[in-house]
Amino acid sequence: MAKITELDHHLNQEKEALDKVVSNLNELCEHNQKLQGFIEIQKEVKELKKEHIKSLSWFKKLINTVSNIKYVFVKSEEQLAKDAIEQNNKLLKRIDNTILSVADKSGPLKQELQKELRKNFENLAKKDLSKDQRERLSNLLNNEYAANPQKFAQLPMSKPLHFPNAEELENQHNDLKVIQQNVLNLLTENSNIEELKKIQKQVAEIREEVPFTKLEKLNNFWQKIKNIFVNNSEQVLAKNKENNTKTIINIEEKLHKANNKFFELVSNKKQDIENIISNLPDSKRLEAIKEKLQKHINVKDTNNIAEQASAAQLQSAETKPTAVVLPNNAIPTTPPVTEEKTFTPPPAPPPPMPTDNIPTPLPVSKAEATEHKNVETAASNVPPPPPPPMPTGNVPPPPPVGDNTVTSTPQKAKETNQPRPAVDTTNLMKQIQGGFNLKKIEYGEDGKPIPKNKEDTKETSDPIIAALNKIRSAKVSSDSERSNSDSGTDSGWASDVSTRSKKVLTRRERNAKQSQQR
């Protein structure tokens, strides 16, 4: 009861719009008095006009009157001229738009409208109508969007698909609605096939939507239906074979035309939009912005393609060893590249000297021999001093410096060593690359090597080797000074520093001395 009261209140608020609908119906009756059935319809319109209070029952009478007018137009369409049909369609469209705009403002009223339209169609379809007339009536009564094309303009579509007037979409939607009804009629006539029954429900559930999506769904269902007709035997289809063939051909042609028409409309609208843009006052500025965007997109695409290609090359290529960055005072392990960009391999190390070719010492006197013997025994009992630090890179040791023999006992080096002077590695690398200059040994008639005097030995002219010799001699002298200062007999005074080396006894002499003491 409350629902009916609410609907009545809503209808009374829309009284002016509903009065316009009644006046439009009266105008239709005046223009079509010659058609059979309009006299009764005119009486119904007069009764509606007398009732000033709008209620739900009055609204249902209005919907029934509009449905009867549409039935008469479908039934007597052949009797009307083309101009009269166009005028009647305009008035009907105006009536439908007003009724739908009133119903859209109330959900319950819209449901009542749909129920009443469905009920009227079922009653009118039972009357004497041909198949095409029944389809036409179904389109007029059930096509909500065809009667309200403004809904198409409100749909969120892209600009190429946006039709402000919605006239093209209205016609397109009407054609699709007729095709849908034809497909449903075909499936109803062949309801003895179970597969078609299932598809019939799906086709009937296609909702009112944008024409292209509806066309796409109809095409998909239509392909399935054709496959079912082809796969079934002729005995099953023998009853309606001729009608099925005609209907299938008719639907196929309509779908093809609707498809072509839709793409034609879309292409035309695209061209219209391009023309509108070209006529704008800032069209040149828009074109410049468009070109900049296009260039930016092209550059971005080329960069992406280049990155993908380089990534693919890195994945397919073999991994190469990375070059190690050496410090300034370090010697690299690989030889430098020459000006001709040819890599010269390092020279092979010199072969080891045979032990037989060691030169024999010169003959000396007995006194010198005993003194030399004492020095050798002292050197045998004292551990040798640590060798000087060698630079990296497998550099051969420098030749020994003169006979600066230190007789004092060397001590272990402290943890804090003096910093070594930096050595320029350029000349040293050249020497390594060019090979080593070995001393030439001359042999006598007896096959033994001829020794050379110290005076004959030439001083090394290479500044690198001379620098290394100086470093080594400085290291040895510093070690000797430390050992002398740390000895127990040294009192720290300059006069107490012993300059003579202690006499070292041999094992035989020590044993003889011990036996005498016993």
From Swiss-Prot:
Residues 418-430, 488-498 have a biased composition (Polar residues). InterPro entries: WH2_dom. Residues 424-441 form the WH2 domain. Transmembrane segments: none annotated. Keywords: Actin-binding. It is found in: Cell surface. One of its GO terms (cellular component) is cell surface. Residues 310-518 are annotated as: Disordered. The keyword Repeat does not apply. Homodimer. Recruits and activates the Arp2/3 complex, which in turn leads to actin polymerization, promoting Rickettsia motility during infection. This is Arp2/3 complex-activating protein rickA. The gene is rickA.
